[in-house]
Structures are given as structure tokens and as C-alpha cells.
Design a protein with these regions (language model features):
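FAD-binding core of flavoproteins
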Residues: 120, 124-233
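Arginine residue identity/basic-tract feature
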Residues: 9-11, 53, 69, 94, ...
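Internal helix-loop-helix
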Residues: 17-113, 158
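N-terminal-proximal low-complexity accessory segments that begin disordered
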Residues: 1-20
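Gly/Pro-rich turn-and-neighbor structural signature
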Residues: 82-150
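Alpha-helix initiation and N-capping motif
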Residues: 6, 75, 96-100, 133, ...
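Terminal targeting/low-complexity segments that flank the catalytic cores of oxidoreductases
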Residues: 4-10, 32, 36, 223
């Protein structure tokens, strides 16, 4: 079920090395002198944003489909956090450094990066802490190495991604100033204790001539189950 979208992602990786597309999809890092993926470049100018748009257009025309989760769609969230480094450092001085290091690593390695946003809905009339304790993602322990988390998230493309930026979509913690459910972190998708439960794919169930996009560009949704997963500081 993963082959269609994995083939597309592989094609995007290959395009960056081909003379016909390399100029639109890569840039030379001013510090290291290395050629990196332009989609993950930290934007600082109008020209940076226009270059990203040109790269997206180039990819979409080549692969012949609108694919939204091919590894860089959540990079913008990292850039927003980078802009708020001073605020993050007020919470914990390590957080600002973590964001800067993550942006650098993703840009250099062209990491397949997705989000882990959507929560199992459960009973929406209740606060997170009043529901099934193992359903919504939350911290169960804090150690010198990091936090241990348990619960679930839904995310498209997680099963074939390198990592996910996991964060809450619920903002009501009741009277609590701090909540074990208010979590944001980067997690490798092969972390110990993390399980992937995927829906079936659309490819092969219908005539490709009648349903060309679902056969060629199906992005698989996954239920991520965190079973006491350690998230390092």
C-alpha cells in the first residue's frame, strides 16, 4: 500500500540530483558550502519564499499529482518556533537550541518530516484528563533522559516518514496551568514503543484510468500508538 507514494518521494529525491531540476530544488548553504534541499531552507527573504514556490511547482508538474505530505510540509512550524526562540528559552533554555539544531539537520539530510497533530476524539464534552487515560497523548514520567509518553495520534504518511513533529490540537486544560497533555516534541518514527496502525490503501481497487490520483498518489493515514515512548530532552 505504500509503494505509490514512496515512489513519488523517491522521484523527488532523484530530481534534486538531476541537472534538469537541481537548480530549482536545491541551494548552496552559505556556511557549509553544501548543496541542500530548498524545501527545508529557513526562509529569511521574499526571494526564499519565491524559490520554494518554484520548487513546489516543479515537483508537482513532474510527478503529475498534488501530494501534500512528502516530507517538508511541516517545516514551516519549525520556522515559527525559531522566530519564537526567546519565548521558548523562557520555558527551558534547551528548547531554542533544539529547534535550531533540528532545522539545520532537516535541511542538510532532507529528512522526511511529518506532523502528529490529530487526537482520537473520544468524548469532546470532557477535558483530556477526564477521558480514557491511555487514549490522548500525555506524559506519564519525567526523567533525566527525557519524558515518557503514552497515548495516540493520527497522522498521514507517518508509516514511511523519518520523524514527526508531535503537538496537541486541544487547548483546553481546564484549571490546570501546566498539563501532562500539553506536549510538543520531535519523535523518530521507529522509536521503541511506537506502533503504526495503517488504513488500507486505495491503489489497485479501481481502474487507474478512472481514478488516476488515488491509484498513483494515495497518502496513507496512520494511527500512532505511543506505548511508554521515551522522548529525549
Amino acid at each position: 500500500i505504500f509503494k505509490p507514494i514512496v515512489d513519488i518521494r523517491a522521484r523527488i529525491y532523484d530530481m534534486a540530483h538531476e541537472a534538469q531540476f537541481s537548480q530549482q530544488l536545491t541551494y548552496i548553504d552559505a556556511t557549509s558550502g553544501e548543496k541542500n534541499c530548498i524545501g527545508s531552507k529557513l526562509p529569511k527573504t521574499k526571494s526564499d519564499w519565491l524559490s520554494k514556490r518554484e520548487a513546489i511547482k516543479t515537483i508537482m508538474y513532474e510527478v503529475g499529482a498534488v501530494v501534500t505530505r512528502v516530507g517538508d510540509e511541516t517545516a514551516g512550524e519549525m520556522w515559527s518556533l525559531f522566530d519564537g526562540t526567546d519565548i521558548l528559552n523562557e520555558v527551558d533554555p534547551r528548547f531554542g537550541d533544539n529547534i535550531a539544531r533540528h532545522i539545520k539537520t532537516v535541511s542538510e539530510s532532507d529528512t522526511f518530516h511529518v506532523s502528529g497533530n490529530t487526537d482520537p476524539k473520544g468524548d469532546r464534552s470532557k477535558l483530556p484528563q477526564d477521558q480514557d487515560p491511555d487514549m490522548l497523548l500525555h506524559a506519564v514520567e519525567e526523567t533525566e533522559k527525557g519524558i515518557v509518553v503514552r497515548g495516540a495520534k493520527y497522522e498521514t504518511a507517518a508509516a514511511y516518514a523519518n520523524q514527526a513533529f508531535v503537538k496537541p490540537t486541544i487547548a483546553n486544560w481546564g484549571e490546570q496551568k501546566l498539563s501532562n497533555y500539553a506536549l510538543g516534541f520531535i519523535c523518530p518514527m521507529n522509536a521503541i514503543g511506537l506502533k503504526h496502525i495503517c488504513r488500507s490503501g486505495f491503489a489497485g481497487h479501481s481502474n487507474p484510468e478512472d481514478y488516476p490520483l488515488s491509484n498513483r498518489a494515495d497518502e496513507i493515514d496512520t494511527l500512532l500508538v505511543f506505548d511508554n515512548v521515551l522522548i529525549p530532552w
